[in-house]
Amino acid sequence: MTNIRKTHPLAKIINNSLIDLPAPSNISSWWNFGSLLGICLGLQILTGLFLAMHYTADTATAFNSVTHICRDVNYGWVLRYLHANGASMFFICLYLHVGRGIYYGSYLYKETWNMGVVLLFAVMATAFMGYVLPWGQMSFWGATVITNLLSAIPYIGNDLVEWIWGGFSVDKATLT
């Protein structure tokens, strides 16, 4: 009798992708980080969407909305901590994925490596926006410190920082 995972149309797709995947026998666990990145990204998107349903960006009520999420929303505290720790796990997996690429010499494939560098910069820019956009003192500090690095650019650095800040300093809510 044949196994259902090899005969059922939907189970067959999953079986061929995960269980009976044709992969070399010498592949190591270092090659799992791309899949782990996908799982972490999916977790971030889902928890971020559910958190955004209850978050308020107004400066007067932002902290209260986070308190509301943690206390009043069913498993809101789990969503918040999964989102926060999922971001850390995402970057751990990302750096290990890049480290594996360096170790195995993937940088020799120039087009692939350059695309990875572009993706790394895009991920870092997205993470910066996710860190700075929600209102709070910590995001003001993050915006000030990280964007102040631009002031090191000769000639245009100070003007660039002032343009990004919209003035002489970071002020008010950044999500409105």
Swiss-Prot record:
According to its record, what are the GO cellular component terms? mitochondrial inner membrane
Its membrane topology is listed as: Multi-pass membrane protein
Pfam families referenced in this protein's UniProt entry, alphabetically: Cytochrome_B
- Sequence positions that bind heme b b566: 97
Chain ranges passing through the membrane: 33-53, 77-98, 113-133
Xref: CDD domains: Cytochrome_b_N
Assembly with partners or alone? The cytochrome bc1 complex contains 11 subunits: 3 respiratory subunits (MT-CYB, CYC1 and UQCRFS1), 2 core proteins (UQCRC1 and UQCRC2) and 6 low-molecular weight proteins (UQCRH/QCR6, UQCRB/QCR7, UQCRQ/QCR8, UQCR10/QCR9, UQCR11/QCR10 and a cleavage product of UQCRFS1). This cytochrome bc1 complex then forms a dimer.
Query: What role does it play?
Result: Component of the ubiquinol-cytochrome c reductase complex (complex III or cytochrome b-c1 complex) that is part of the mitochondrial respiratory chain. The b-c1 complex mediates electron transfer from ubiquinol to cytochrome c. Contributes to the generation of a proton gradient across the mitochondrial membrane that is then used for ATP synthesis.
Protein name in UniProt: Cytochrome b
